[in-house]
C-alpha cells in the first residue's frame, strides 16, 4: 500500500544553487545545467559569526543538551545532518530527512497532515488530535505540537539534530521516543543570499530564495521564500486525474538585534501553505469483497501494486495553513548564559478522504477540520564555571487550544454494499427496527449522507521545571544528573451526533 510516499527520484533533476557571504549571487539552472549568474559587491559590517571561520569548519556544534557543545562532548545519542549534506541530498522537508538519518522513519498516513515520526520503532500521535506525538519536533527551539505544524518545506537550515531515545529530562512529556531539532540560519551582518530553481520529472518545480544583510550596525534581517510543486505520480482511472502531488510554499522573515557581544534578540515570523491531493493507495490484493464493489459499478485495480494506479470516486484533499512567530533573547551574564524563547503557532487544516479507496460511493465523507493555537514560553539559565561542576535549570510553559470537527457519512452505494456482503441480512433487518420505532420511513437504514458528526474543544496547559548538573569527575569522564517535574492539565468538551434513523433506538428497553 502506498500512502503518498514518493519515490526518491521525483523532482531531483537539473538543480544548481549558490550561496555567498559578502556578495549577492543568483544562479538558475534548468534543462541540463544551462545557467546564468549575477553578482554584485556588498558592504559588510564588522560582526561575523565565529562558526563561519575556516578553522572551525570541522567542529560540529550541537544544542541537543540545550547548550552549545561539540558533538563529541554531547552525552546523548544524536545524529547531526549538516547544511552541506542537506543541500547535496536535496532534503526539502522532514519527510526527506529519513533518507540520511539512521533509525528515523517518517510515515505519511491518509493525509499530508497526518504524518508519523518514528525513532527506533517508536512514535505515535498523528491520527488523534488529542494526543501529542511521542517524537518532539523543535524548529529554532520552538515546539511544534502537532504533525500538521511540522511538515512544511524546511527553511534555510544550518543543521538538523535527531536525538534518539527518551529526552524527557530537558524536553518534557512529549519526547519519550526522541527529538527532531531543526536549527535555521540567523540573519547575517554581511549582504548575501541564495536562489535556487530546479526542474525534474513529473513536472517538479522547486524555487527557493533568500536574502540577508544589515539594516544598521546592530540590526540584521533575512527574507526567504519557497515554492514546491509536482504532478501526482498515481493515476486515478475513475477521475482521470493524477494524485499524490506536491503543491506547497511559504515565506519567512527574521530580524536579529545585536547591540553588544553579550546580548542578542532574534525575531522570526513565518507562514506556509499546503494544498494537495493526497494520499492515494494502490491495491495489493483483490479480496472477496471486490465482487460486491464491481456489482455496484465500482472499479478496482486488481493485484498490480507497482502499477501506481488507483480508482476512487472523489479526490482526497489536504489543505493546511501553518503560521506563527517567535522571539529568542540570549544574554551573557558573565558566568551564566540566560535564554528566553516565546512563541505562538497556529494551524488551520481541512482534509477529506475517500476512505473506501474504491470508485463505488461507499464512504460519502471522511473529513476533519481543525484549528490549533499554541503558546509556549521557556526560560533557562546555564552556568559557565571554571570548576568541575556546571548546571542548567529552566522552566517551560505550554498552552494549547484546539477546535476540531469531523464527519464520517455513508455514501450512495453503502446500503447495497452492506446488503450484498451480508447476504441481504442488512436490509432485511430494517423492517424489524422500524417495528420498534414506528413512523420511521423505509429505505433509510445506512442511507446516503447519514453518519456521525463530531465537534471537540480541547484545552491543554502544562508547566514544567527541569535541570541538569554536569560533574567532571576526571578528564574525559563526566557524570550528568537531571530531573524534570511537569504539571499537565487537559480539559475537553465534545458533541457527537449520529444521524442514522435508528440511532435513537434503545434496544435494551425494547427487550432485544
What function would you assign to each model-found segment?
Residues 55-190:
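Acidic, small-polar-rich N-terminal luminal/periplasmic segments of exported/outer-membrane proteins
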Residues 67-69, 115, 124, 200-202, ...:
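Structural signature of outer-membrane beta-barrel domains
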Residues 86, 98, 160, 180-182, ...:
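Hydrophobic packing within well-folded, soluble alpha/beta domains
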Residues 181, 188-190, 198, 210-305, ...:
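Periplasmic-side early beta-strands and strand-to-turn transitions of outer-membrane beta-barrels
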Amino acid at each position: 500500500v502506498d500512502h503518498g510516499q514518493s519515490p526518491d527520484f521525483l523532482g531531483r533533476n537539473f538543480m544548481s544553487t549558490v550561496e555567498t557571504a559578502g556578495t549577492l549571487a543568483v544562479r538558475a539552472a534548468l534543462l541540463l545545467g544551462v545557467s546564468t549568474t549575477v553578482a554584485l559587491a556588498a558592504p559588510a559590517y564588522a560582526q561575523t559569526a565565529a562558526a563561519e571561520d575556516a578553522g572551525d569548519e570541522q567542529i560540529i556544534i550541537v544544542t541537543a543538551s540545550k547548550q552549545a557543545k561539540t558533538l563529541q562532548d554531547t552525552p546523548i545519542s544524536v545524529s547531526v545532518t549538516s547544511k552541506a549534506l542537506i543541500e547535496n541530498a536535496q532534503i526539502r522537508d522532514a519527510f526527506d530527512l529519513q533518507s540520511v538519518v539512521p533509525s528515523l522513519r517518517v510515515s505519511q498516513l491518509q493525509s499530508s497532515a497526518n504524518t508519523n515520526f518514528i525513532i527506533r520503532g517508536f512514535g505515535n500521535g498523528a491520527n488523534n488530535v488529542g494526543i501529542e506525538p511521542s517524537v518532539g519536533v523543535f524548529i529554532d527551539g520552538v515546539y511544534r505540537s502537532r504533525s500538521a505544524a511540522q511538515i512544511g518545506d524546511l527553511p534555510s537550515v544550518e543543521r538538523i539534530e535527531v536525538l534518539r531515545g527518551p529526552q524527557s529530562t530537558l524536553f518534557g512529556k512529549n519526547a519519550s521516543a526522541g527529538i527532531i531539532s531543526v536549527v535555521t540560519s540567523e540573519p547575517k551582518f554581511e549582504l548575501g543570499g541564495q536562489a535556487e530553481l530546479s526542474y525534474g520529472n513529473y513536472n517538479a518545480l522547486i524555487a527557493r530564495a533568500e536574502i540577508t544583510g544589515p539594516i544598521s550596525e546592530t540590526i540584521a534581517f533575512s527574507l526567504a521564500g519557497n515554492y514546491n510543486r509536482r504532478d501526482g505520480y498515481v493515476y486515478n482511472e475513475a477521475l482521470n486525474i493524477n494524485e499524490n502531488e506536491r503543491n506547497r510554499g511559504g515565506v519567512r522573515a527574521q530580524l536579529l538585534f545585536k547591540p553588544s557581544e553579550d546580548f542578542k534578540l532574534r525575531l522570526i515570523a513565518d507562514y506556509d501553505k499546503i494544498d494537495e491531493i493526497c494520499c492515494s493507495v494502490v491495491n495489493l490484493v483483490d479480496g472477496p469483497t471486490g465482487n460486491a464493489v464491481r456489482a455496484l459499478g465500482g472499479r478496482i485495480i486488481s493485484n498490480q501494486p507497482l502499477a501506481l494506479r488507483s480508482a476512487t470516486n472523489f479526490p482526497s484533499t489536504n489543505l493546511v495553513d501553518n503560521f506563527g512567530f517567535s522571539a529568542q533573547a540570549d544574554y551573557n551574564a558573565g558566568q551564566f548564559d540566560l535564554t528566553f524563547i516565546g512563541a505562538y503557532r497556529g494551524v488551520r487544516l481541512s482534509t477529506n478522504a475517500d476512505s473506501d479507496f474504491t470508485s463505488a460511493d461507499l464512504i460519502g465523507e471522511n473529513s476533519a477540520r481543525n484549528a490549533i493555537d499554541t503558546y509556549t514560553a521557556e526560560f533557562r539559565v546555564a552556568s559557565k564555571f571554571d570548576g568541575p561542576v556546571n548546571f542548567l535549570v529552566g522552566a517551560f510553559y505550554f498552552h494549547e487550544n484546539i477546535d476540531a470537527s469531523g464527519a464520517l457519512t455513508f455514501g450512495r452505494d453503502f446500503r447495497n454494499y452492506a446488503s450484498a456482503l451480508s447476504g441481504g441480512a442488512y436490509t432485511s433487518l430494517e423492517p424489524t427496527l422500524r417495528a420498534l420505532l414506528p413512523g420511521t420511513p423505509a429505505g433509510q437504514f445506512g442511507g446516503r449522507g447519514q453518519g456521525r458528526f463530531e465537534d471537540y474543544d480541547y484545552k491543554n496547559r502544562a508547566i514544567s521545571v527541569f535541570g541538569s548538573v554536569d560533574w567532571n569527575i576526571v578528564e574525559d569522564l563526566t557524570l550528568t544528573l537531571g530531573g524534570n517535574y511537569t504539571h499537565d492539565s487537559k480539559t475537553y468538551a465534545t458533541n457527537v451526533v449520529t444521524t442514522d434513523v435508528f440511532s435513537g433506538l434503545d434496544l435494551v428497553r425494547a427487550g432485544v
